Amino acid sequence: HLSLRRQRQMCIRDRFTALMFLALSVNVTYAALFRQSDLNNDSRNTRVRDAEFSQNRGDILVGSTAVARTVASDGQFHYQRTYAHGKKYAPITGYYSYYYGRTMLEQTQNPQLTGTSDAQWLSRLTGTLGGHKPQGGSLLTTVNASAQDAAWEGLRGKKGAVVALDYSTGAVLAMASNPSFDPNLLATHDLKASQQSWKRLLDDPDNPMANRASREIYPPGSTFKLVTAAAALQHGYTPDSQVSSPKAYTLPNTTNSLTNEINCGGDNVTLTHALEISCNTAFAKLGVGLSERTLADQASKFGFGSEPDSDISMATSKFPTQLNDAQLALSSIGQYDVAASPLQMAMVAAGIANDGVLMEPYLTRSVRAANLQTVWSHKDTPMSTPMTRKSAKQLQEMMVSVVNNGTGRNARISGVTVGGKTGTAQTSPDKPPYAWFVGWSDKPKVAVAVFVESSNTERSEIAGGRLGAPIARDVIEALR
């Protein structure tokens, strides 16, 4: 009996051991087949990181100019990542650092840049058979150098951001943020110098590493009235509908009074006129009448609460929920807890300008493998339909009226149809407000958002579009 018992125990042990080996085998096989890309692209993977720094990483191109490229090095690693016009293009390229990983396109398109993407399997195979060292693919971006120059120059001496989109495709034409930083400081193989630069950048009170264009969110102020206007047009209002516009509006169930920057022109005005002069009381009352759910749904259709499924690293913009009527009134004019990135507000303008269809924004037009063959090209993708064509056409005309007759006059361009909306957003009583301008033009087909942080400019000039509108105009002009 002891012998049979021992045999039974040994049999159970052997089966258990076999099952353990089988489970291990399945796990390893699963990781190799299905998680290889995730593991390879995790910047904490030191083995892969060391290998990456010893290979020729692909270029990031703006036109024919490599704004990020890899050069041979005699240092610790075989190749050094370098950036041309680093500060200007940092919000697009991001950085590629041994200690601090990757950001922006360097991160989102890492498989393409390292040559490990599925699209480059044939290039890898032919390279291996030919005895060539691994080499990454190059990205041809959608960025227009002239538009980027105009955006960058427009932000000189200011804190803020500019985003320009081709609203018919979603292509990012410009993405600038100031103050910025030089990615070369973090890409250097002098690892001690890289650490020192990192600390210095983090300690800088101007926060130059913040990508204000897509990775930071701010109160959108009166530019959010475009979302409220869109919701109204989608729910039975017309540009000529009369809306209540008192000089002051006591927020529901409070003693707090909301006022206007200027006289709205009467107790009742058309929806178009309310947008032209950015009437706070009209849009606050309008939002309360529409309901929280209606505004939240409209904001969601423009992209609030989600991120595009693309190569852009984007913070999630937000429209608050569970609001009382006073909070809803403030949210309807882009205050309270509403927050959006400049990219998000450019998407709002783009959805309106493209007859109600919002295209997914993207930065990479195509990928070229090491053998110079194009192995991947972007396919334009509708992201949502925030408005009907009819409502979008109506809001376009209202925005054109803002530029021709209202607060957006500084964006006017002779011979070009330009629609826009100015905005101010109060952050605290002791600081000047943020300045915004959101707009679009018909030729070229571009939607633009300009954001400028607190400045010493008079509030009346901010509300009048003196800061943002001229920058938007210059970006549009650069694309003509």
What feature does the model see in each segment?
Residues 374-379, 468-480:
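Short, gly/Ser/Thr-rich active-site loops of penicillin-recognizing serine hydrolases
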Residues 14-29:
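Hydrophobic membrane-insertion alpha-helices, especially the h-region
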Residues 1-8, 12:
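Single conserved hydrophobic/aromatic residue that forms the stacking wall/gate
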Residues 33-34, 41-42, 48-136, 153, ...:
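Small/polar-residue-rich segments within soluble enzyme cores
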Residues 172-222, 227-454, 464:
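Beta-lactam-recognizing serine transpeptidase/beta-lactamase-like catalytic domain environment
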